[in-house]
């Protein structure tokens, strides 16, 4: 199954294990005011709880749009990192979809598992799928979600060409 090879089910833990502690992160933008972001984070917290994680804190930042490198600004990322280190947090869940580069950059900075809303929802479906057909459909959805992220991961090799002279 996909979860065995690609660790797509990052919240899954043994039954007796402590639930993972997570922080939720969202952006207040010109398109989304504070009240709307609070509503989205309430929903995200419910999803995290459904997946088996406990929300320890929420972080928001008011910006014009997501940072292409790390979704949030460097100062906010540092604030989140300090909180994670001080409070035994194992996961950060972002309200919006993240690119593969953003996930890699954020993981490097925060040193915890990074999920976005879509990967969290797919995780919930994977945990609850019972029939072989349902499991296959969830696995297909996970692959479809991963495909563009995996494709963009190798763009750093585009200029390297083989050939003579």
Residue ranges and their predicted role:
Residues 1-123:
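N-terminal accessory targeting/assembly segments
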Residues 120-165:
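Extended, highly charged alpha-helical segments
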């Amino acid at each position: 199954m996909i979860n065995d090879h690609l660790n797509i089910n990052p919240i899954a833990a043994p039954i007796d294990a402590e639930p993972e502690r997570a922080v939720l992160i969202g952006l207040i933008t010109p398109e989304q005011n504070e009240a709307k972001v609070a509503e989205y984070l309430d929903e995200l917290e419910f999803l995290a709880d459904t997946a088996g994680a406990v929300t320890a804190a929420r972080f928001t930042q008011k910006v014009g749009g997501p940072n292409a490198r790390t979704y949030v600004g460097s100062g906010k990322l540092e604030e989140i990192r300090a909180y994670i280190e001080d409070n035994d947090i194992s996961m950060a869940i972002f309200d919006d979809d993240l690119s593969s580069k953003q996930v890699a950059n954020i993981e490097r900075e925060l040193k915890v598992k990074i999920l976005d809303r879509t990967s969290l929802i797919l995780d919930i479906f994977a945990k609850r799928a019972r029939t072989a057909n349902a499991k296959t459909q969830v696995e297909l959805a996970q692959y479809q979600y991963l495909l563009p992220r995996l494709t963009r991961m190798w763009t750093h090799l585009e200029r390297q060409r083989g050939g003579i002279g």
